[in-house]
């Protein structure tokens, strides 16, 4: 789940899920929707360490933003042992706001029962 939050940044959300992977999926959805990305069918894969920390989340999402700038968008996220396999799809077109980076501002994982949540603030 995600909901926009008021912030001085152009794009900020509170996101939640039952797992670290679900938080990453929400971040991916924000990137795809805010940037207005239309995907093609050509794919490539990339592996990421599965470390359920704010630092790893920050690094992973910012790497995705770099990949988007190169014409590839994260599409599928799958846990494989102690790594995450992310399948990227070639970007056909972008019609939204360019996101430059995820910031550390308000990025703090919190557990509420089975729900993991944080806030994400993006620079545009």
Curated annotation (Swiss-Prot):
Binding-site residues, Ca(2+): 7, 10, 123-124
BP GO annotations: tRNA processing
Entry annotated with the keyword Hydrolase: no
UniProtKB keywords: Calcium, Metal-binding, tRNA processing
UniProt cross-references to Gene3D superfamilies, sorted A to Z: Archease domain
UniProt GO MF annotations: metal ion binding
Pfam (any one): Archease
Its job: Activates the tRNA-splicing ligase complex by facilitating the enzymatic turnover of catalytic subunit RtcB. Acts by promoting the guanylylation of RtcB, a key intermediate step in tRNA ligation. Can also alter the NTP specificity of RtcB such that ATP, dGTP or ITP is used efficiently. May also act as a chaperone or modulator of proteins involved in DNA or RNA processing.
Family statement: Belongs to the archease family.
Protein's name according to its UniProt entry: Protein archease
């Amino acid at each position: 789940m995600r909901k926009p939050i008021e912030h001085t940044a152009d794009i900020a959300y509170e996101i939640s899920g039952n797992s670290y992977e679900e938080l990453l999926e929400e971040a991916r959805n924000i990137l795809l929707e805010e940037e207005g990305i239309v995907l093609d069918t050509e794919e490539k894969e990339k592996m990421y360490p599965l470390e359920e920390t704010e630092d790893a989340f920050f690094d992973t999402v910012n790497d995705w933003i770099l990949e988007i700038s190169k014409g590839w968008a994260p599409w599928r996220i799958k846990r494989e042992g102690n790594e995450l396999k992310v399948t990227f799809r070639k970007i056909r077109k972008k019609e939204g706001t360019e996101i430059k980076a995820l910031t550390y501002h308000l990025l703090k994982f919190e557990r509420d029962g089975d729900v993991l949540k944080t806030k994400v603030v993006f620079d545009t």
